[in-house]
Amino acid sequence: MKEYIEFLKDKMAISCQTGFEVNPDELTPSLYPHVKDTVRWAVSGGCRAIFSSFGMQKTVTQLEILRVVLKHKGGKGLIVCPKRVVVEFLTQAEQHLHMKVTYVRTMADVMICPTDIMVTNYERVRDGEDGVRIEPSYFTATSLDEASVLRGFGTKTYQEFLPLFADVPYRFVATATPSPNR
């Protein structure tokens, strides 16, 4: 049993808190209490994973997290999601948070984007267009939606995303299906 405990300890990665405290009054008033709690918890950690069941407002939670971080720290935010979910982010942002979010395809789009929060799909970051990908290091805060795509340790997406996002100060992932990577 002792060997197994040591094995588990070797696999643990302890994350330091790199975030900041958020006053509840700073949050969008119409959010559900569980969303407000999740946003405050995530921002206080600075780099957190959100495992929330379908229908628990992960989309709005991620948007609010990025809004709060950018309000305090400046810069731009990027949400990376499957292509089929992009429209959901655009509509939920306006419907629930009264904010405009822009879909970006290239770094050129990013550089001229008028909104603070942008959304793109995984392939735009992983593969890019004509070999030029969107650079996560440009952003102050990022969130990876449907992060279950990262669960396969040997996949191209997993292997490429870890180093790409290493320099982003505020990193978040959200999924309804937590699963170990290694």
Residue ranges and their predicted role:
Residues 1-169:
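SF2 helicase/translocase NTPase motor core
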Residues 54-55, 168-182:
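Conserved helicase ATPase motor motifs in RecA-like P-loop NTPase domains
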